[in-house]
Swiss-Prot record:
Species the sequence originates in: Danio rerio (Zebrafish)
Residues the record lists as binding 1D-myo-inositol 1,3,4-trisphosphate: K18, H167, K199, N297
Upper taxonomic lineage: Eukaryota, Metazoa, Chordata, Craniata, Vertebrata
The family this protein is said to belong to: Belongs to the ITPK1 family.
Entry superkingdom: Eukaryota
SUPFAM superfamilies: Glutathione synthetase ATP-binding domain-like
EC number: 2.7.1.134, 2.7.1.159
CC cofactor: Mg(2+)
Protein's UniProt name: Inositol-tetrakisphosphate 1-kinase
């Protein structure tokens, strides 16, 4: 680790639940071994008295949601953090509070996805039609669905994309079940994707793709099937197995995610929001092969990503350095745990469509860098590439 990180101070605030789930103390110890001073923030006390900080890492989503609902304690805590940020523009915040607020509102994040889709002008990328429903369904609802290009079946999701209730969803198959929809919520067209979800976990310049179970295929158009309620978190667990995730009715093709497409989407989100720690849920249309972003998550759980701590330390080091490789795209490859000195372009590694199965039974794609180029992912072996996103964005 470079000497420039020694003596740097990094503040962090995560809920106790998040700290335990990530085993974050291991990361704290890793940083301290590299000479980085890690300070757990006490939000009940002025942050000014706990600083100064070169970087602050946080997951304040619970408090931000509560603050937006005028919960006094959370209002004060979030305002305290914002006051420190305003007073210390030199401190790097992972990630910016306005960006987190965007990701906590599915309406805002879906609008952003649509905007980015148009700017990318890539036929391999699509964003499902959606609309926001703020009141109970009425006679005009069908007209609104048609206006927004939403057809049956569609998914009904809570507008707030955080908390236990954010995972409670329903698939609506016909006009008859519109009366059961409880606003405020977001209605999003359902795309058949052969019951496979790809979770993209981004950390600075690196990302990993993990394959998870998802909702099975359903016939297009209205049917007499009753609405199905489900918890998306439970459905997409690695071990999930139910009638909802059954793959017996697979049709079309089972497409693998395109490395180039995922890099493009990740870079655009990074550029638009200035975020570094986020997850992207992607499904692939089983007829067209188009990649559809169906959700974006702030500071996800990184389950199935053993490189998370290494990537986070690398990103913090790059942030502290103030640049990445002097603006030149660079990277290293890790094969079976052994670091290689060469710069790697993802397209050099072939187009094998197999996926690795880790010790926990989680199906995974290779670990990539955002600046790599190439086509489909190539999981012949475990790949770990870091490259400079700064170099990519500076030329655009």
């Amino acid at each position: 680790m470079q000497t420039f990180v020694k003596g740097k101070r990094v503040g962090y605030w995560l809920s106790e639940k998040k700290i335990k789930k990530l085993n974050f103390q291991t990361f704290v110890d890793l940083c301290r071994k590299q000479g980085i001073e890690m300070i757990q923030l006490d939000l009940s006390q002025p942050i000014e008295s706990q600083g100064p900080f070169d970087v602050i890492i946080h997951k304040l989503t619970d408090h931000i949601v509560d603050a937006d609902q005028n919960v006094t304690e959370s209002l004060l805590l979030v305002q305290g953090v914002q006051d420190y940020i305003d007073a210390h523009p030199e401190t790097v915040i992972l990630d910016p509070l306005p960006a987190i607020r965007t990701l906590l509102d599915r309406c805002k994040s879906y609008k952003l996805i649509h905007k980015l889709e148009h700017s990318m002008e890539d036929d391999r990328i699509c964003s499902p039609p959606f609309m926001v429903l703020k009141t109970e369904c009425g006679f005009e609802t069908l007209e609104q669905l048609h206006k927004h290009g939403i057809t049956f079946p569609f998914i009904c999701k809570p507008q707030v994309a955080h908390g236990t209730n954010s995972h409670e969803m329903a698939i609506i198959f016909s006009e008859e079940d519109l009366k059961d929809i409880k606003p405020p919520c977001v209605l999003q067209s359902f795309i058949n994707h052969n019951a496979v979800l790809y979770k993209v976990f981004v950390v600075g310049e690196a990302y990993s793709v993990v394959q998870r179970p998802s909702i099975r295929n359903f016939p297009s158009g209205p049917t007499d099937r009753r609405a199905i309620s489900f918890n998306s978190h439970h459905v997409s667990k690695p071990e999930s197995s139910s009638h909802l995730t059954c793959r017996d009715n697979m049709v079309g093709q089972s497409w693998k995610p395109s490395n180039e497409v995922i890099q493009k989407i990740s870079r655009k989100l990074h550029q638009a929001l200035g975020i570094s720690l986020f997850g992207i849920d992607i499904i692939i249309n089983n007829q067209t092969g188009q990649h559809a972003v169906i959700d974006i998550n702030a500071f996800p759980g990184y389950e199935g990503v053993p490189e998370f701590f290494d990537d986070l330390l690398s990103h913090i080091s790059s942030v502290l350095q103030g640049q990445v490789c002097n603006g030149v795209a660079c990277g290293h490859l890790r094969v079976n745990g052994t670091a290689q000195s060469q710069t790697v372009h993802c397209g050099m590694l072939g187009n094998d469509s197999s996926w690795l199965m880790d010790s926990e039974g989680i199906k995974k794609g290779p670990h990539q860098g955002l600046s790599c180029c190439g086509g489909c992912m190539t999981p012949n072996f475990h790949q770990h590439t870091r490259s400079s996103l700064t170099a990519e964005t500076s030329s655009q």
